[in-house]
Structure formats: structure tokens, C-alpha cells
């Protein structure tokens, strides 16, 4: 079973941050992937990812419209990065990218436009 860590963050830090986190949880359940999700919203950082979780993750998914607080934590990881809009509009495209990156070398970074 694959294990993902993710961060969601939008400009206002209200609805879309949490909508993306909720949708990702459901998609990972369908894929039978474990997932831990950190949200960076109006209330600050919630469910902050532990360094150990990031280290053991197969892939990090950075769903953001803003500069993430602590983005350097993911430099050594395979990751897929996309906007909140792209994820909410085309979640299957993003999940397909995650599947591809799962088998890529460490430190593979895929940024979706």
C-alpha cells in the first residue's frame, strides 16, 4: 500500500483548503493508499506533518496556490505539485501523476500546470 503525505493551502485559507483535503482523503481511500494531510489555512497550520511521516512517504502531494510554510521539508521527496483549482477541477489527472511518480527515483518533482 502506498503512503502519501499532502499539504493543502489556498489564498484565503478557508473553503478550498479544506475541500481539497476532504476530496484527497476520499480519493486515497478509493486507491487504498494511506494519507496524512496538513492544511495551511486561515486558522494557521493544522495537522502538521511529522518529519517521520514525510521521510516514510512514498510521495508528497502539494496542493497549493500560495508559498507553503516549510516547503523545504519536501525537497528530498518525490512530489507532485498543483494548484487547488487544478486538483478540484481534475482530481483524476493529479492522481494519475501521483501514480507515475510512485515508481520514479527519489527527488523526482512533477509540477502540474
UniProtKB/Swiss-Prot annotation:
Modified residues (Phosphocysteine): 10
Matching PROSITE patterns: PTS_EIIB_TYPE_2 (PS51099)
GO molecular function: kinase activity; protein-N(PI)-phosphohistidine-fructose phosphotransferase system transporter activity; protein-phosphocysteine-D-fructose-phosphotransferase system transporter activity
InterPro entries (UniProt xref): Bacterial_PTS_Sugar_Transport, PTS_EIIB-like_sf, PTS_EIIB_2, PTS_EIIB_2/3, PTS_IIB_fruc
CC terms in the record's Gene Ontology section: cytoplasm; transmembrane transporter complex
Top EC class of this enzyme: transferase
Record carries keyword Transferase: yes
Active site: residue positions: 10 (phosphocysteine intermediate)
This protein's UniProt keywords: Cytoplasm, Kinase, Phosphoprotein, Phosphotransferase system, Sugar transport, Transferase, Transport
Reactions it catalyzes: D-fructose(out) + N(pros)-phospho-L-histidyl-[protein] = D-fructose 1-phosphate(in) + L-histidyl-[protein]
GO BP, one annotated term: phosphoenolpyruvate-dependent sugar phosphotransferase system
Pfam family membership, one: PTS_IIB
Location of the PTS EIIB type-2 domain: 1-100
Highest taxon, organism lineage: Bacteria
Note on domains (UniProt): The PTS EIIB type-2 domain is phosphorylated by phospho-EIIA on a cysteinyl residue. Then, it transfers the phosphoryl group to the sugar substrate concomitantly with the sugar uptake processed by the PTS EIIC type-2 domain.
Protein's UniProt name: PTS system fructose-like EIIB component 3
Species, as recorded: Escherichia coli (strain K12)
Gene: frwD
Amino acid at each position: 500500500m502506498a503512503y502519501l503525505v499532502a499539504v493543502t493551502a489556498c489564498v484565503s485559507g478557508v473553503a478550498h483548503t479544506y475541500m481539497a483535503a476532504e476530496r484527497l482523503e476520499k480519493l486515497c481511500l478509493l486507491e487504498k493508499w494511506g494519507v496524512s494531510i496538513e492544511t495551511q489555512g486561515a486558522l494557521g497550520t493544522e495537522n502538521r506533518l511529522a518529519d517521520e511521516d514525510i521521510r516514510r512517504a512514498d510521495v508528497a502531494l502539494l496542493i497549493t496556490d500560495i508559498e507553503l510554510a516549510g516547503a523545504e521539508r519536501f525537497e528530498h521527496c518525490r512530489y507532485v505539485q498543483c494548484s487547488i483549482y487544478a486538483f478540484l477541477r481534475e482530481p483524476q489527472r493529479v492522481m494519475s501523476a501521483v501514480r507515475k511518480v510512485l515508481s520514479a527515483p527519489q527527488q523526482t518533482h512533477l509540477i502540474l500546470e
